[in-house]
């Protein structure tokens, strides 16, 4: 069992149950999945660069990414139907908890001028963060990076409100800005 999963079942569930006063234990929020995505429209013109970014996403997540393709052609953007324009990975289970542990303890402290993430969610129990640079991940070999590329991370939970979601993620180790 992952260190974070064990901590969730033994400690976090109890503190969430006490803080929010749920009627039963099935109402306690759970982290369902983590989705990592990259928009690679500029890299789509250069196949070697596109493959390099796919390899980086594979190293970051530990899974092979799904290439997202254009649904229709747009001549103004020189985009053809079926052309690869991005990549995404969905993490569940043990890989999800391992990624969350690495992100909170290793990656987020490496972000330059980091003072915490915004505590605004989507209102339905999901929380998203956009990173400007993939080089903050220790799995990435800095000598092989051809171009810096952003990365979007979305945490999907069973929480009903932003407060429940941010409290769950904060107890798991994600750092948020302090309310002033």
Curated annotation (Swiss-Prot):
Part of the 50S ribosomal subunit; part of the 5S rRNA/L5/L18/L25 subcomplex. Contacts the 5S rRNA and the P site tRNA. Forms a bridge to the 30S subunit in the 70S ribosome. Belongs to the universal ribosomal protein uL5 family. Gene3D superfamilies: 3.30.1440.10. InterPro entries: Ribosomal_uL5 (IPR002132), Ribosomal_uL5_bac-type (IPR020930), Ribosomal_uL5_C (IPR031309), Ribosomal_uL5_CS (IPR020929), Ribosomal_uL5_dom_sf (IPR022803), Ribosomal_uL5_N (IPR031310). This is Large ribosomal subunit protein uL5. Transmembrane segments: none annotated. GO terms for biological process: translation. Signal peptide: none annotated. GO terms for molecular function: rRNA binding; structural constituent of ribosome; tRNA binding. The keyword Ribosomal protein applies. It comes from the Bacteria. Keywords: Ribonucleoprotein, Ribosomal protein, RNA-binding, rRNA-binding, tRNA-binding.
